Design a protein with these regions (language model features):
Chain B
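Iron-sulfur cluster-binding electron-transfer modules in prokaryotic oxidoreductases
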Residues: 1-264
Length: 484, 264
């Protein structure tokens, strides 16, 4: 079973895909309904805005503190993991991550890997690499399983199959799972998935999982999940490989508690998830279960680029709750696939440029009205709109003197836009010239073009008023003098 | 977001920063805002050299260009008077982004910070500084309110319009669905991503119209142009009006020469 490799996403592609979804009333309605549901679930968990504010401030502090000590914490994490019997690997990019995991699989002659939900494994295209090496990598999270069966990519970081309706899934299972007939009964559908997966857990050579929080002080990996498949993946097969980004580390176990509480409430509106796994090493002597061997792969993939800049570093505070997507009016209109990145929505717009470079992603920071809904709900207070503006600047300009260029720096620069904004600055920083312009624009308003690029696709043309406010005020002054 | 308001007596003088949109595209709203202030006994000063807050360049990532335009506004408000802005997003630009824009120039930063402190969105100023108390003089009507994202999330003024309208006995304010959602304008976003922007504007127009209100109100010129332009293209007669104009009309104008009532 394969998923398609990540699609390259040049600006025109994004625009085209977005326009396609927007023109589909069925999809529009379905996304809107799903997002409304998630928004309401989250809101119900936060009845007291002041308390929420205090919690967000604390969570932000913890994430900032952790990042401020990142190199030291990573060293401490590694030392403690090794002490606990976990092998630690460092991967600078997706190829390295895949090679490491493939190497471990080969050591064990592995044929089958069962996977818990891991966005970093999506980010490095692990399934694709495993498939190319002839190893079956099977998703065991229900949403991921559905997406994999369909040969697609997740469209949401928490709910990978949110773009699929019950009917889509019924059809998919009937087509792809041997011996299953069409049913729209959700419980029956879930049971189909369970039956398939249950057996695979027993047969798998390798269990792969993500990590929500890595605790430096104890060398523990925390895994948040609802289906129990994460626990199966990390305990049943003989080898457990965890994969995560280098930013996920916190110093102490107690730092996990406030983050966990906000993560589940922000993501699915749950006060707590059904499962919370704290994994501190492989099976020990005398223990009856657990993997005999355990690995952690720590992936950089552009994170150090974000880390190097004080402002952009805030991107790494993210705990991947998905609330920014759920509340994003753009994501709600176009869904996750239009972005063409592993992480869609607002978080995707600010993190993908570091992972894929600005040449492939420069359009994404611009795919926002800067309405601020994302920053308002982000549990770790990432100022997403400010970061979008910053990336818009980096995408259209050379690096500032003394600053290292980002990968793909300036790739979105166009002569048209540069000239337009130069013209804007020229006109609006010269009051006398602007007054002349305003005078002309109002007098010659009949010359206003009726086709105004994107604006008039769905709106009537913009036309200056017959008299500007300045004109009206000047007239009033004359009137006043006359009436004296 | 909620600010500390200046203590002390009611100001006698204010500056009015019209914004480029109001100056050229909805000057009537600017006039009505000025008259609302004047009726409270305030002298309104309109610096002739004002142009634009620089926001279009700033949000598009052209910080140098935004700085050039913003710099041209910094010296226009020398007296220590409040600066009233009839648009949430431009007020937000001056109040929150000017100090950041000049972060690396201590002299200009000090100026920008001083200005930022004095910037008020119109409804905020009317309600919180002037404590206006109005009597409604219009026929019963139903309206719905679109609060801009900047008013809501940058200025924290989204409830002020509601409170002002609550003073008007004949005005019923109807609740739209997805009230806090953006109308899809987003400055240059509306031309860079026309399909998404158009879909958002269209959904917003639907939500406002579905309330059954006679009209919708907004304190932001950009949102008004976006939603009204969408409705007009659909040949729908439902329209939005700037909050300032509505307030001026409902409260009877001043009876003076330039009152809306007289012009009509
Ligand atoms: S950016 Fe904030 S809201 Fe978005 S996924 Fe990350 S933590 Fe959640």
């Amino acid at each position: 079973m394969t998923t398609q490799p990540m699609q390259f996403v040049p600006g025109s592609e994004f625009k085209r895909r977005a326009a396609e979804v927007v023109a589909n009333p069925f999809l529009r309605k379905s996304f809107r309904g799903a997002m409304d549901f998630l928004i309401a679930k989250r809101a119900a968990q936060f009845p007291d805005p002041e308390l929420l504010e205090r919690q967000r401030t604390l969570a932000e502090e913890i994430r900032r503190y952790s990042l401020s000590r990142l190199p030291a914490l990573l060293e401490q994490l590694e030392a403690n993991l090794v002490k606990n019997g976990v092998k630690v690997h460092w991967a600078e990019n997706p190829d390295e991550a895949n090679a490491i995991i493939l190497g471990i699989c080969r050591q064990h002659d592995a044929r089958l890997m069962v996977k818990g939900k891991s966005m970093v494994s999506e980010e490095v295209e692990l399934n694709h690499a495993m498939d190319a090496a002839g190893i079956e990598a099977l998703e065991s999270d229900m949403g991921e399983y559905i997406v994999q069966l369909a040969g697609e990519k997740p469209s949401h970081i928490i709910m990978p199959a949110i773009h699929k309706t019950k009917q889509d899934i019924a059809k998919l299972f009937a087509e792809k799972v041997p011996g299953v007939s069409y049913t729209e009964d959700v419980d029956a559908l879930i049971q189909v998935g369970r039956d398939v997966l249950r057996k695979k857990f027993m047969d798998a050579d390798i269990g792969l999982s993500g990590v929500n929080f890595a605790v430096a002080e104890t060398g523990s990996l925390c895994l948040v999940e609802n289906e129990g498949n994460g626990r199966m993946c990390t305990t049943v097969p003989n080898v457990h490989i965890a994969i995560t980004g280098i930013e996920k580390v916190v110093e102490k176990l107690e730092h996990v508690v406030p983050l966990y509480g906000l993560l589940t409430r922000s993501a699915t509106g749950q006060a707590i998830t059904t499962y919370f796994n704290v994994i501190t090493g492989p099976r020990r002597e005398g223990e009856k279960d657990g993997p005999r061997e355990m690995h952690l792969v720590l992936v950089d993939n552009g994170r150090t680029q974000a880390y190097a800049d004080e402002q952009l570093r805030q991107t790494l505070q993210c705990i991947r709750c998905g609330a920014c997507m759920n509340h994003c009016p753009v994501y709600t209109r176009i869904g996750g696939h239009a972005y063409g990145t592993t992480y869609p929505g607002p978080i995707g717009e600010i993190i993908s440029p570091h992972m894929m470079g600005l040449a492939a992603t420069h359009v994404l920071p611009g795919a926002s009205t800067l309405c601020g809904a994302c920053g308002e709900v982000c549990p770790v207070k990432i100022p997403i709109p400010d970061l979008l503006i910053r990336l818009r600047e980096e995408a259209t300009h050379e690096a500032k003197p003394g600053h290292a260029p980002l990968v793909g720096q300036g790739a979105g620069k166009t002569t048209f836009a540069s000239l337009a904004f130069k013209g804007f600055a020229f006109l609006y920083s010269r009051p006398a010239l602007y007054r002349l312009f305003a005078w002309g624009a109002t007098r010659f308003r009949f010359l206003t073009p009726s086709n105004q690029a994107g604006w008039t696709a769905t709106r009537t043309p913009l036309k200056p008023a017959a008299k500007s406010l300045r004109d009206l005020l000047a007239e009033r002054r004359i009137d006043e003098r006359k009436s004296c | 977001m909620q600010r500390n308001l200046p203590a002390g007596p009611r100001p006698k003088d204010v500056y009015f920063f019209a914004t480029c949109l109001v100056d050229l595209f909805c000057p009537e709203a600017g006039m009505d805002a000025i008259q609302l202030l004047e009726r409270e006994g305030i002298t309104v000063h309109f610096p002739e050299n004002q142009t634009c807050c620089g926001q279009p360049a700033y949000t598009s990532g052209y910080a140098d260009e935004a700085r050039a335009v913003a710099k041209a506004q910094l010296d226009l408000f020398p007296e220590n008077w409040p600066v009233v802005v009839p648009s949430g997003s431009c007020a937000g630009m001056m109040r929150h982004h000017y100090p950041k824009l000049f972060a690396e120039d201590p002299m200009l930063k000090a100026k920008a910070e001083n200005l930022a402190e004095r910037v008020f969105e119109l409804s905020e100023f009317l309600l919180k500084v002037l404590n206006v108390k109005w009597k409604d003089s219009g026929k019963p009507t139903k309206v719905t309110l679109h609060t801009s994202c900047s008013a809501r999330r940058e200025m924290g003024t989204h409830l002020h319009a509601r409170e002002l309208l609550a003073q008007l006995d004949g005005v019923e304010v109807l609740q739209q669905s997805h009230e806090s959602e953006c109308c899809g304008f987003g400055g240059t976003f509306s031309v860079r991503q026309p399909a998404i922007s158009g879909a958002m504007a269209s959904d917003k127009a639907d939500a406002l119209k579905e309330t059954g209100a006679d009209a919708f109100l907004s304190a932001d010129g950009g949102c008004l142009m976006n939603i009204n332009g969408t409705l007009e293209k659909r040949r729908d007669s439902f329209r939005g009006q700037h909050l300032a104009s509505f307030l001026w009309e409902r409260t009877g104008g001043s009876g003076g020469k330039n009152g809306k009532g007289e012009k009509a």
